[in-house]
Structure formats: structure tokens, C-alpha cells
Amino acid sequence: MLYLAKMRNAEGEFTENEQKIATFLLAHVGELKTVSSRNMAKQLEISQSSIVKFAQKLGANGFTELRMALIEEHSVSREKKRDKAVHLHSSITSEDSLEMMARKLNREKIVALEETYNLMDYERLEQVINLISKAPLIQITGVGGSALVGRDLSFKLMKIGFRVACEVDTHVQATIAQALRQGDVQIAISYSGSKKEIVLCAEAARKQGATVIAITSLADSPLRRLADYTLDTVSGETEWRSSSMSTRTAQNSVTDLLFVGMVQLNDVESLRMIERSSELITLLDRS
């Protein structure tokens, strides 16, 4: 359970007192060995029960468990920083060599993958896979880089026999959304969860009785509140947010998991269709 990542990425979901607690913990994570809930409550001018409830909201049994987990996470994080300090920095600069940029990008993508997989609710993922597998029609929505992720997923799902509607034009996305029916599924991909085009499509899909699955960040957002199910992605972008590379890496990791899970549900037939598709493409290449 990555509590530090949860607090950094879900600040918009916190109440005023919860935000005080999160800010304090993030600012003093290196000093938590000497921090008690009593002293913390006194310093923040809140009740001890508020601190316990905050810990439980994050998934811990109580403050003691949360405090010990944060101490451990901080220790591991410091060790990782020491390991990479010789050849890596925190962001890409104009002075970096190509090799240095490659190392930084590689590390950024690895962190995005690790944190996304570590925070994944696998029971929820299994529910989502089962829902998608039974859907008469699957619509995938996204804008910009998220649209590319959606396009990739749509090709994969069509390859194993699913009916998928994935259009880049947001006007067409909205038109498809308002025509969905009960039993259909809309997969909405947006890291911010606040793109008006995607939110509008999600609202239209919900109105028609379709199930909305959001692939989005942990932060509170209109899309997150609208969705029936959320699959969380974690991404710490560098100062040079070149096409949101680590965000797309995190999103692709989730969509690839969805696809492999779908293949696993009906592996023999899915693999047969994948092979048949490859054979047809080979014939096209020969002509």
C-alpha cells in the first residue's frame, strides 16, 4: 500500500481537516518516529479521532499502522534515491545528454508502472473485465494522448472479437455515447478526469443506462464521481511533460491488463482469432 502516493495524488478528495493531516505527514515524513497522534492532534488543533479516521480512509487500521508504513516507505524511497543519485536527477534539463535523458525517462516510466500496479484494486479489475466481456458494445473515449491509448485498446479488443466504437473526433464520441444502451460499457480514459468532452460523454452514457469505467488518476474529479468503476493510474511527470509520457505508460499498463484479462477469459477462442488476424495481415503484406 503506497500511502505517500495516495496522499500526493488524492489531495482533492480530502476534507479541510484531512488536508491538514496529509500536509503535515508529507512535510514531516522523515520525523514520524517521534510523532504521536496526540501531539499531532494538538499541533493541528483537531481531534485524535480525526487522525484515526484519516488513516482508515487511506486503508490502514489506525494511525500507528499508517505511521509505521510511512516510515518504511520513506526509508525505501531514500534508498532508491541513493541508488540512482550517481547517474540520475529529478528532471530532464536542456544540458542532459541523450544517454542521461534515456536513463531518466526509463526511471520515470518504471516508477509509473510500479506505483500503478501497486495501487491497483485487483478485485475491482476482475469485476470490470467480467463486465466488459458481456457488453454488446464497448465505447472508448479519450482526448489527445489518452485517445491514442484508447485506440490501441480498441484494436486489441476488436482482434479478439469484441464490438468496439472508438473515434478520435469528440463530436462523434458524444454521438455514440448518447446511443448506448443498458448493458453497453463506456471506457473513459482521462488522467485529469476533468476534460469536458470526456465528462459530457460519460454523463450521456450514464443517462442511457450504460456502465462507465474510468481510467484516471487518484485525484477527485468530475469523471471519477460519474464513473461506476475506476481503474487508478499514478504518474509523476517531470518538468518537461513531453506528451505526458509517464501518464501514457501508466494508462497503457492498465489497458494491457484489461486486454490480457479478456484473453484469459476465453483463451482458446481469443488466441485462435489473434492467429487468424495475423494470417490475414501476412496475406496483405504479400500482395
Curated annotation (Swiss-Prot):
DNA-binding region per Swiss-Prot/TrEMBL record: 37-56
Xref: InterPro entries: Homeodomain-like_sf (IPR009057), HTH_RpiR (IPR000281), RpiR-like (IPR047640), RpiR-like_SIS (IPR035472), SIS_dom (IPR001347), SIS_dom_sf (IPR046348), Tscrpt_reg_HTH_MurR (IPR022821), WH-like_DNA-bd_sf (IPR036388)
The segment(s) forming the SIS domain are 128-268
Q: Source organism's superkingdom? A: Bacteria
Per UniProt, the keywords (alphabetical) are: Carbohydrate metabolism, DNA-binding, Repressor, Transcription, Transcription regulation
Pathway listed for it is:
Amino-sugar metabolism; N-acetylmuramate degradation [regulation]
The HTH rpiR-type domain sits at 1-77
Which GO biological process categories is it annotated with?
A: carbohydrate derivative metabolic process; N-acetylmuramic acid catabolic process; negative regulation of DNA-templated transcription; regulation of carbohydrate catabolic process
Q: Name one GO molecular function term.
A: DNA binding
What does this gene product do? Represses the expression of the murPQ operon involved in the uptake and degradation of N-acetylmuramic acid (MurNAc). Binds to two adjacent inverted repeats within the operator region. MurNAc 6-phosphate, the substrate of MurQ, is the specific inducer that weakens binding of MurR to the operator.
| PANTHER family on file | GLUCOKINASE, HTH-TYPE TRANSCRIPTIONAL REGULATOR MURR
Subunit record text: Homotetramer.
Identification of the protein by name: HTH-type transcriptional regulator MurR
Q: Which organism is it from?
A: Salmonella arizonae (strain ATCC BAA-731 / CDC346-86 / RSK2980)
What gene name is given for the protein in this entry? murR
